[in-house]
């Protein structure tokens, strides 16, 4: 005759203090592996830096640096000027003969372009500006600096411009350039013909 559980045992079981029985037998438990997989180490994206071009790419075989001189007549010519900047050619921009609105529009565009190229701009005189590509220091080039027009041909550079850029302008050369600009301004004031021209003295 099977032994009946005693009153005490039944009370303990009723209250939940009895011996716990495993619901699973040995061997029924499965080892659960984590579902994730290790990812291969990622390489950080290379840092984008401005393009650095050595200065040795500019001098020609004769040891001179070709400076492109431009006197634009329309805004459509700015693309050609920017192409010269992108090719790392120094540019002298002459805006003396343009009206105020067109000159300012061209100047703003080219200033933005040379900034994007990490170059520098320098005002030479009233209406004349110099754009240097990155890595080009005109003051260290010596006198081996010549002017050339887009498409070739002779260039009539304003007196003293290149010398002033190199820091070697004499008083007479620079004075001639400034005097010529002053004469043009005075003639425009007298005749009223050039009142629409840009006031470069405020730039």
From Swiss-Prot:
Compositionally biased residues, Basic and acidic residues: 39-50, 183-203
GO cellular component: cytoplasm
Gene3D superfamilies in alphabetical order: SepF-like protein
Localisation: Cytoplasm
Region of interest: Disordered: 26-51, 167-203
Coiled coil regions, renumbered to chain: none
UniProt keywords, alphabetically: Cell cycle, Cell division, Cytoplasm, Septation
GO biological process, one term: FtsZ-dependent cytokinesis
Xref: InterPro entries: Cell_div_SepF, Cell_div_SepF/SepF-rel, SepF-like_sf
This protein's name: Cell division protein SepF
Organism: Symbiobacterium thermophilum (strain DSM 24528 / JCM 14929 / IAM 14863 / T)
Gene that produces this protein: sepF
């Amino acid at each position: 005759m099977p032994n009946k559980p005693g009153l005490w045992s039944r009370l303990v079981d009723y209250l939940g203090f009895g011996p716990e029985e495993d619901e699973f037998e040995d061997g029924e438990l499965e080892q659960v592996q984590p579902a994730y997989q290790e990812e291969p180490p990622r390489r950080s994206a290379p840092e984008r830096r401005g393009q650095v071009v050595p200065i040795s790419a500019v001098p020609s075989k004769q040891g001179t640096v070709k400076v492109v001189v431009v006197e634009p007549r329309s805004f459509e010519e700015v693309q050609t000027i920017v192409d010269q900047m992108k090719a790392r050619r120094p540019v002298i921009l002459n805006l003396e003969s343009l009206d105020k609105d067109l000159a300012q529009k061209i100047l703003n565009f080219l200033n933005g372009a040379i900034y994007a190229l990490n170059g520098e701009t320098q005002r030479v005189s009233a209406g004349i500006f110099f754009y240097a590509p990155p890595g080009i220091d005109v003051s260290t080039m010596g006198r081996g600096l010549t002017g050339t027009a887009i498409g070739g041909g002779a260039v009539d550079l304003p007196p003293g411009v290149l010398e002033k850029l190199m820091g070697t302008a004499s008083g007479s050369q620079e004075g001639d350039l400034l005097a010529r600009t002053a004469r043009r301004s005075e003639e425009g004031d007298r005749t009223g013909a050039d009142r629409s021209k840009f006031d470069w003295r405020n730039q």
